[in-house]
Structures are given as C-alpha cells and as structure tokens.
Amino acid sequence: GLGSVPPAEWGEIGAFATRAHELSEDRSAWMKAHERAAILHRAMEIMKERRDHLAFQIANEGGKPLIDARVEADRAINGMDLCIHELGALKGTEIPMGLTSAGDGRLAWTTREPIGPVVAVSAFNHPLNLIVHQVAPAVAVGCPVIVKPASDTPLSCFEFIDILHEAGLPKEWAKAVAPSRDASEKMVTDPRVAFFTFIGSAGVGWSLRSKLSPGTRCALE
C-alpha cells in the first residue's frame, strides 16, 4: 500500500477545538507576525528540498501524471511564498473623525486580528496545493487550523502538516484529521469554529453551510 492515516474520533477533534479556542482567546499566546513568517519560510524551504518526493506522493495517491504532480508541488511551494509576502500587506485603515464636532481632533483606525479557529475541508484533485491554499493563510495570520483532506488522498495533507510542525509550528496550532462522517459534521458545526473553508461539490458545500453555528463565517469553493 501507499500509506495510511489514523482515524480520528470526535474526542480527539473536540480536544483540539477546545485548545484552539483557548489559544484564540488568549492574546498572550498569539504568535508574532515575524515568528509566523519564519515558520512558513522554513516550511517552504523544506518543501523545496523534498519537491520530488512530494510530487511522487501526489502522483501515487491520486493517480495524477507525474508531470502534473510536479507542477502542483511547485504551485504549493509558490503558495507558501505568497502567504509570507501577503503578511506585509495586512494593514488597517484610518477612519475620518473630523466630520462631526464630537470627533474633531481625534484619531481612529482599524487593525486586523486573527478571526479564530479555522476548520478546512478539502478535495481530492490537488491533494497538496489545495491544502496549502486553505491551511497556510490561516497559519500566516495566526489562526489555529484543523484540516480534513479528501478520504481518497490524505497523505499529502498529513505530510504538509508534519512539515509545518518540523518548521517550528507548535502542534496545537495545526492538525490534520481523518474523521468519520459524524465526527466531520460535529467538527464543522462546532460553535467554537470562527471560519470554515470548504473545497468540493456545491451540494455538500451548501449543505454544510446551512448547518454552521451562528457567527461562523465561511468560504465555499
């Protein structure tokens, strides 16, 4: 066989969600931007070193031609670079305050902060690049993330999370899981989830969106 991943029950997933919520609520536990950028850069360098291995794994687990798998590996590496550079573009805006006498002489501005725990559910057709698209931005902005890859192609996802940990990301900030259908739905609809990102069929995506807890934002692709 090509490999296997351990099944995850709700107890394990729920414990991670609890810790993710705690991290998000405790500002003193947040990683600094330069720390997150350094982790992503180290992970990108590891991916460059293992590019051929990652490409073979993509090809083997999904049946993709190797020439296309190499393109996917390169796109995933580039996606990491984009996340690092985008960190420098995250900024707030000034709010005009002199439009009323009450605001005259005052300053106000917005800042961007991590939204909170992210749950990602991904698809089979790009088992590494799609995971990078969903997970790396969350790590970049300081959101703990739990990701469920497609059941047919989980190996690249689990390896990417391992690479992030190898690069210095604490394990409590990112986790790959292969849950049952019941545990998957509990994970997605948990009220502690701040953002849900889904890549897959429209029917499944809209169905899951209808079950999200109040306040959970989502992106469907």
Q: Which residues does each predicted region cover?
A:
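Rossmann-like NAD(P) dinucleotide-binding subdomain of oxidoreductase/dehydrogenase enzymes
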Residues: 92-221
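Glycine-rich loop-to-alpha-helix module at the N-terminal edge of alpha/beta enzyme cores
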Residues: 2-91
